[in-house]
Amino acid sequence: MELEIVHLYHDLLNTYGDDGNVKILKMRAEKRGINVNVKKVSVGDSFKDADILFLGGGQDYEQTLAAEDMVKNRAELIKSYIEDGGVGLFICGGYQLMGGYFVDGAGKKVKGADVLPVHSEAGEGRFTGNIIVKNSLETLVGFENHFGRTYLDGGEALGEVLFGNGNNGKDKKEGVIYKNAIGTYMHGPLLSKNPALCDDLIRRAMIRKYGSCVLEPLSDNYDLLAKADMIKKLLKEDGAK
C-alpha cells in the first residue's frame, strides 16, 4: 500500500513551517506500513493526480505568484480532483488561494482557484495567537497569524472557535470542510497537535484509493496530555478576562 502526497508551491508558500504537516502525514502513515512518496510541485512543474494534496501559507507577493500559476495551469485539475473526493489540506494563504478570490493588503483583488466555497479580504489588524476549535472529530488547537478575513459561501466550517479569532473574528467559525478537503488558518503545525485529524486525512485517502482502511492506533498519550493542558490553560485565561 502506498500514498502520494503532492506538496504545491513548497518554495513559495512555507513561511510558517507548514511543511511540517507533510512530514507528520508521512510519519503517521509509514508507522502503519503505508509507503509514502512526497512530490513537490511549483511553478512550471506538472502532476496528474495525488492521494493527498497540500498547500501551505506565505506572504502576499508569493501568494499572488502562486495564484497566477494555479489559475492559469492547475485550477481545473485541482477542482476536478476535489470534486471527485480527493483529499486536500490547505493552510492560511493556501486556504485563501483555494477560494473564489482574495483581496490582498494593497487592495488588489486576486482570482483564486475557486476550489473551496470561500472568499477572503484583507482586514485592518492581524489575528495572532493560539486558537482552539471545537470539531466533531476532536477539539483542535493551533496558532493563527493572518490579516485575511475569510467568509464561507457554502460548505461547512471546520469547527466553532472556543478561543481565538478564526475565519474573520465575527462568526466564531474557523476553516471550511468541503467534500474531503479542509481549508484552515491553523498553523502549529496543525497535524502535529491534532493526531486524530491527521489520521482522518490518511484514512480518507486510503479509502478513496483502496476502498477500505483500518489504521492501527498509535501511542499519542503524551501529545494528548500536553494538548489537554494547553486547552485548559487557555480557556481558563479566557474566562478570567
Model-derived features: where do they sit?
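A structural micro-motif
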Residues: L3, V36, G86, K111, ...
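Cysteine-nucleophile active-site neighborhood
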Residues: D60-L137
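Amide-donor transfer/coupling interface in amidating biosynthetic enzymes
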Residues: A122-K241
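A residue-level signal for conserved active-site and pocket-lining positions in enzyme catalytic cores
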Residues: I5, A113, N145
